[in-house]
Swiss-Prot record:
Span of the signal peptide: none
Protein name listed in UniProt: Cell division protein ZapD
The entry's keywords: Cell cycle, Cell division, Cytoplasm, Septation
Subunit structure comment from the entry: Interacts with FtsZ.
Biological process, per Gene Ontology: division septum assembly; FtsZ-dependent cytokinesis
Taxonomic source organism: Cupriavidus metallidurans (strain ATCC 43123 / DSM 2839 / NBRC 102507 / CH34)
NCBIfam families per the UniProt record, alphabetical: PRK05287.1-4 (NF003656)
Pfam families (UniProt xref): ZapD (PF07072)
Gene Ontology CC annotations of this record: cell division site; cytoplasm
Length: 252
């Protein structure tokens, strides 16, 4: 199944963007070529940009604390798997502790490292990181791959608590919903929300329907899923077919 996700608010949108960026960082960090490690470094810059737009650390701590308080009373419920519950609460508490021990904001990493700041200022310019622009960076790229990787890991380490906290919140959110089979009649589906508040919509599409692309939108009253196809020039065009998919609405 192919999963498409749509966030209902800016906070979840930010967490999804961070998740995507951290996954990208993992991939390029595991590669060997200097250009791939260049992408890893610029991805760290993007993570700092996204995380620095709001007081994300405080928001994550508040949300994790709210989830911990909601789960704590379940310890006396015999119908709940207590081992699984304790594991989740322990993970939440570890996330809160890691975030609480993090000093400063995400952007502090750049403020404390002039060398990285110089790379970032050039990286926003097309072709701005050539060897004649940043000879020290060019020399660094010729180091052994393991040495470069160790440096990047060191620079990314201050962001680990944000990744941990965001990952816990997103996993709990995704596990909060139940999926149901629906059909987009004539390529379109809409559903009244009846006053219920959601934070994330998931659309699961069978891989045999890869040609159909869901475009999702929502407000506090209704959600829409409209399927399109791309023509030879990759332009979207409407679909008239009935398309089955799984819909999952998630909310804490």
């Amino acid at each position: 199944m192919i999963l498409y996700e749509y966030p209902f608010n800016e906070r979840i949108r930010t967490l999804l963007r961070l998740e995507d960026l951290f996954d990208r960082l993992d991939y390029f960090l595991g590669q060997e070529h200097p250009l791939q490690h260049h992408v890893a470094i610029t991805t760290i810059f993007e993570i700092i940009d996204v995380a620095g737009r709001a007081d994300l650390k405080t928001d994550l701590i508040k949300e994790l604390e709210r989830q911990r308080q909601a789960l704590a009373p379940l310890r006396s419920n015999p119908q709940i798997d207590q081992d699984a519950l304790v594991a989740v609460i322990t993970e939440i508490e570890q996330g809160i502790a890691a975030l609480s021990q993090t000093v400063g904001k995400a952007g502090q990493l750049l403020a404390d490292n002039e060398w990285l700041t110089s790379i970032r200022s050039r990286a926003i310019i097309p072709g701005g990181t050539c060897e004649f622009d940043l000879p020290a960076y060019y020399a660094w790229q010729h180091r052994d791959a393991d040495d470069r990787r160790a440096d990047i890991l060191k620079w990314a380490r201050p962001l680990a608590s944000l990744r941990m906290g965001a990952g816990i919140v997103l996993r709990l959110l995704r596990e909060s919903g139940q999926s149901g089979k629906v059909i987009a009649t004539g390529g379109s589906y809409q559903q009244m929300l009846s006053g219920r508040s959601y934070q994330l919509m998931q659309v699961y599409l069978d891989e045999s329907l890869l040609a159909f692309i869901p475009e999702m939108s929502a407000n506090k009253y209704m959600l829409w899923v409209r399927f399109t196809q791309q023509d030879g020039d990759m332009r979207p065009r409407s679909v008239d077919a009935d398309i089955p998919f799984l819909l999952k609405l998630c909310n804490f």
